[in-house]
Amino acid sequence: MLRHSLRWFLRFVLVAVIIPIVLGAAISYARGWPESWRNARWESSGLLPQARDVPEALVMVIAARTGRWKSIFAEHTAIVLKPEGASDWTRYDVVGWGSPVRRNAYAADALWYGN
């Protein structure tokens, strides 16, 4: 009974965990990774409307793939705020463990290194 349960558990882990990770890695590799974060595109992706065209207050969490092999497992997230009636978005994000929160280092909906 235990042996049968262990066999089913291992099959589940293979199908639910291992195969998706391997497929994700293969797809990411096939698409190609940027050579360096210094050469990456950082401009606006065009996903957000102009802040002045949105009268209400908004809080958004945006995410983009990280660079190279980390993109298999991780995304970079940023919080984007717009107070009611404001004419600009405000973006907050952290790059690197223990680093301070950055404010408006890039466009609110900027592409990230892994994009």
Task: Say what each PLM segment does.
Residues 10-28:
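Hydrophobic membrane-insertion alpha-helices, especially the h-region
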Residues 32-48, 52-115:
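Glycine-rich catalytic cores of cysteine/serine-nucleophile enzymes that process amide/ester linkages
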Residues 1-7:
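N-terminal Lys/Arg-rich, disordered targeting/topogenic segments
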